[in-house]
Amino acid sequence: MQDIKTYLSVAPVLTTLWFGSLAGLLIEINRLFPDALSFPFF
């Protein structure tokens, strides 16, 4: 039962960090390369 409580307390933290870093990465990519619609035409 303790393992389940540990998992339930760790999983939201890891997913928040993961999605936060993913959002930051996408924001930086869009800042460096503003028009992502032009990528398929290169």
From Swiss-Prot:
Bilayer topology annotation: Single-pass membrane protein
Signal peptide: none
Subcellular localization, as worded in the UniProt entry: Plastid, Chloroplast thylakoid membrane
UniProt keyword list: Chloroplast, Membrane, Photosynthesis, Photosystem I, Plastid, Thylakoid, Transmembrane, Transmembrane helix
A single BP term in Gene Ontology: photosynthesis
Any one GO CC term of the record: chloroplast thylakoid membrane
Top-rank lineage group of the source organism: Eukaryota
Family membership noted in the UniProt record: Belongs to the PsaJ family.
Name used for this protein in its record: Photosystem I reaction center subunit IX
Record gene name: psaJ
